[in-house]
Amino acid sequence: LKTELNPQQTQAVEKTEGHVLVLAGAGSGKTRVLTERIAYLVRDKKVSPDRILAFTFTNKAAGEMRGRVARAVSGMGAPSWIGTFHATGLRILRREAKHIGFKNNFAIYDEVDVTSLVKDIMKKKGWKLDEYPPSAVRTRISRWKTGLVPPGEAFDKAVDRLEELYATVYGEYDRQLKKCNAFDFDDLIVRVVE
């Protein structure tokens, strides 16, 4: 496969010190470069496959990469940590959730579950759902989460009364998820940081 690589791609494959950033357009060979890099590390540099972590953005790309790497290192053992950010986060949380106060058999709330929980919290607080759209509250909670802003800090940093109200929902939302031993989709990445 290395014969199909251009000089810059070959350099990215063979660089073993420091980080490598591969930027290129669709169909330009990024997956081929990453696959060959992993194979090079396993075959030529004798890196144990279980010491390699590779992220992709889609399940399809992860499956393709796993297949390509398995063929490239045939018989040497392919890395088991090739997946999407969310799938990898889920895998880590299933093993380590106890360290952040959750059980390993946690539930994952989908958008329907999340919207229902936000609506329930808002109703209990006496909010009129036509005045405060639950989707707007959910979007704000997601932004806080992905920005690694915990509920208390979100309230403290609120710029107006509406944001304070959203932050109170966020705090209750977070408590309810923990009480139900559940994560939402954002948590599959965010909670791994904890």
Where are the predicted features?
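Conserved RecA-like helicase ATPase core segment
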Residues: 1-7, 30, 34, 43
